[in-house]
UniProtKB/Swiss-Prot annotation:
Superkingdom to which the source organism belongs: Viruses
Name of protein: Putative gene 38 protein
Provenance organism: Bacillus phage SP01 (Bacteriophage SP01)
């Protein structure tokens, strides 16, 4: 059995063919000093061997190590039988499912959004609304990402205040950040 890499909603394994071409996926180092890796889709292979990846200005240079990946296509289950493990195991979202419990104002606000995607520090986008969940206290704040104050601190603006969240808190899992998208249709919780 080969090692599987999960990225987004896709699963990858190492592609031993070595044939890098447009549309291929690669695992690459994006932060040399910290040893941070990411998965990217190749949009162009330059004549000099550089790989241009989807996204603004992402280039894998000749001195950057990378591993060629291929996507594992799994047989889809019926839509009704599928359970999102992260959704199912989240105590807040389980509480939302149990309608006999009274919801806090923050939880009621969360129920207005039906799409929540966990994001990591390198995925944050300015002006996008995020739900910031503190693991220990269970508190949820909503705010717009304003950018990095410095390489290790992200700034979020709320109605009358701002939050400074360290990248270390995100990496350790002490704080989770979810991108929230308001559903235009009727909420699934109503």
């Amino acid at each position: 059995m080969s090692v599987q890499i999960k990225h987004g909603n896709k699963t990858f394994v190492v592609d031993p063919s070595g044939d890098v071409k447009e549309g291929s996926y690669v695992l690459y180092l994006y932060e040399y000093r910290l040893g941070e890796v990411d998965v990217g889709r190749v949009s162009e292979v330059a004549n000099d061997g550089r790989l241009y990846l989807d996204g603004p200005g992402v280039i894998v240079t000749l001195d950057q190590p990378f591993i060629l990946l291929k996507e594992v296509v799994e047989e889809e289950e019926d839509e009704d039988d599928r359970i999102d493990a992260e959704f199912h195991n989240d105590p807040l979202l389980r509480k939302l499912e149990n309608t006999t419990e009274k919801l806090t104002p923050e939880e009621t606000q969360l129920a207005q959004w039906t799409t929540m995607t966990r994001v990591f520090s390198h995925d944050l986008k300015k002006g996008i609304p995020y739900a910031i969940k503190h693991k220990n206290s269970g508190n949820i704040l909503y705010g717009l990402y304003s950018g990095l104050l410095n390489p290790v601190t992200a700034l979020f603006r709320h109605l009358n205040e701002e939050s400074k969240i360290s990248i270390e808190q995100l990496k350790s899992g002490l704080i989770e950040i979810y991108e929230v998208v308001e559903d235009e249709e009727e909420s699934i919780w109503n």
